[in-house]
Each structure stands twice: as structure tokens, then as C-alpha cells.
Regions:
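Sequence-specific dsDNA recognition surfaces
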Residues: 13, 30-46, 60-92, 235, ...
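Amphipathic alpha-helical coiled-coil/heptad-repeat segments
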Residues: 1-5, 173-248
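A short glycine-rich beta-alpha junction/loop motif
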Residues: 115-123, 154-182
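Non-catalytic DNA-recognition/assembly elements of restriction-modification systems
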Residues: 8-41, 169, 173-181, 185-196, ...
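Short, conserved charged micro-motifs
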Residues: 131-135, 178-181
Length: 248
């Protein structure tokens, strides 16, 4: 329902997508973006061809919601190919295949590395002005998108792949551009709050573990006397709760 819980809804016309807000559009991804394939490794060049060595992204670099830059490789390509396969800021990176949980996962390229290329198993989706890259990246992480990628993928033993044509045929629910931005901001705010609460909970657990270890250490080294210790009652009630005839 977007940000308005009372918004009018309509049937999206897509069984696995269900209803969407009435003012949203639902259309194939190709209406809002183009797809750029990547380069294939292992190509050799004649001595008279100008080449350059540049970094490139593999499937392992494209994680769910972020780019892992810890293991970026380089590749030698012709200067013409370098221009063709060079990533642009705002491209949405999506994996062609792998394990089912990796299928179609994506994130926005923010220009983290200059003149970076991408492998042929990594799609670069280039949205037009009607589609926010962040909105598309969020959609790829949704249950609806994962269902589509699974249904339209080619399955083999423990592996799956989705073609660029099936990818670009994916029905995309898209609100007006302003609402895309507002929804993204709201999701980021909520995600940050969840991260904060998670950190607080993890710190509390870590502190309790440390105190437990310290207590055990003190007990086994004779620093505290636990011979008369009794566990607290699992059920305690104020005196006012004890009525006549109740067990004492």
C-alpha cells in the first residue's frame, strides 16, 4: 500500500503480485530501463589492438543490497570494449544466476571504483527518468521479485539462471517518482531503527555472556560462596493477590 494505509487498491493483473495501489503502474521492466550485458573472459587480441587492464565485477561481488569490493579482479580488454562495458553511476547490478538465493539479487552501483566493468553473468540495468535505481534494487529483494525470478529461471542441479529477456519482462509495480523517493526514505529510516535495536540487543547479550562467564569463574575459584544460593521462584505474587482460601 505504499505509505498510505487507506489508499485505494486495484488488481495488478499478475497473480503472484496481487493488489497494488490504484494510482501505481504495473508494466514490464523494459518499459522503464535497458539492460547491458557484460564481458566474457578469456578473449585474446591481435598485437595491433589497443588494450587496457581494468577492474571488473563478478557474481561474487554483487551481494544482496551491496557491492563486495574485497575481491575485485582485473581483466584486459580492448579500448572499445572498455567503453561498452563500463558501469555508470545509477546502474542496478543484478546476477544472472547461481544458487536460487543469489538469483536476481541486486544493488545500485555508486561509482565505488573508477572505470569498472562487469562480467557477462552480471546484468547492468539502466533505469530511465521514471524509475529510481533504488526502487528497482529494493524490488529485486522483495518476495514478489524472488518468486518471478524462480518461476522464469532455468533450473539445474543446485543452480539457476535467468535470461535477460525474462528479466526485462518482469512486471514492475511503480509509483510516481516522488512517491518512490518518499518510500525509499521511509524504508531507510525504519531499517536504521531496526539496525539500532539489533545492535542494542547484541550488546546486551554480549554483556550477559561476559557476566555469566565472570560468575562461573568466581564460583569455581572460590571467590564467592554459592552453597546457600537458591533460585528465585518462577511465580511470585504480591500479598494483595492472595485471597482467602488461596494456598499460602
Amino acid at each position: 500500500k505504499g505509505l498510505d494505509p487507506d489508499v485505494a487498491m486495484k488488481d495488478s493483473g499478475v497473480e503472484w503480485l496481487g493488489e497494488v495501489p490504484a494510482h501505481w503502474s504495473v508494466a514490464p521492466l523494459r518499459w522503464y530501463a535497458t539492460v547491458q550485458g557484460g564481458l566474457a573472459k578469456g578473449k585474446t587480441y591481435e598485437p595491433n589492438v589497443d588494450t587496457v587492464e581494468l577492474p571488473y565485477l563478478r557474481v561474487a561481488n554483487v551481494q544482496d543490497g551491496y557491492v563486495d569490493l574485497s575481491g575485485v579482479h582485473t581483466v584486459v580488454v580492448s579500448t572499445s570494449e572498455a567503453e561498452r562495458y563500463k558501469l555508470q553511476i545509477g546502474d542496478v547490478l543484478m546476477n544472472e544466476g547461481g544458487d536460487n538465493d543469489k538469483l536476481g539479487r541486486g544493488t545500485v552501483w555508486k561509482g565505488e571504483i573508477e572505470s569498472c566493468l562487469h562480467q557477462n553473468h552480471v546484468f547492468a540495468i539502466r533505469p530511465n527518468q521514471s524509475l529510481s535505481p533504488e526502487w528497482l534494487a529494493l524490488f529485486t529483494r522483495s518476495t514478489s521479485a524472488r518468486v518471478y525470478f524462480y518461476l522464469y529461471s532455468k533450473q539445474s542441479t543446485n543452480l539457476a539462471s535467468v535470461s535477460s529477456s525474462n528479466l526485462m519482462s518482469c512486471p514492475l509495480p511503480i509509483p510516481p517518482k516522488k512517491e518512490q523517493s518518499e518510500t525509499i526514505d521511509e524504508l531507510r529510516s525504519r531499517a536504521n531503527e531496526i539496525d539500532r535495536l539489533t545492535d542494542t540487543a547484541n550488546n546486551s547479550v554480549r554483556l550477559l555472556v561476559e557476566r555469566r562467564s565472570a560468575l562461573i569463574s568466581a564460583a569455581v575459584t572460590g571467590k564467592i560462596d554459592v552453597r546457600n544460593w537458591q533460585p528465585p521462584s518462577t511465580e511470585t505474587f504480591p500479598d494483595s493477590f492472595v485471597t482467602e482460601g488461596s494456598p499460602a
